[in-house]
Amino acid sequence: MAIQSKYSNTQVESIIAEVSAVLDKHQAPTDLRLMVLGNCVTDLLARKVPQEARAAVAEQFSKALAQSVKG
């Protein structure tokens, strides 16, 4: 999603492959996959982002997601 990242493409792609493999293992349909990933994002925000910054981080994330699917 990000144009520039402090993480390598290899690192990102490796994690994506592992997460995808777990979802494949459970034969999760697309709607369940999206629900699980959304819940992971919500949990991550709740645990790792200070409460006063959560709304702004969630908004920034949602804008980046929307931009990434525009092509």
Curated annotation (Swiss-Prot):
Top-level taxon in the UniProt lineage: Bacteria
InterPro entries: UPF0352 (IPR009857), YejL_sf (IPR023202)
Pfam families in UniProt: DUF1414
Annotated family: Belongs to the UPF0352 family.
The protein, known as: UPF0352 protein Ssed_1809
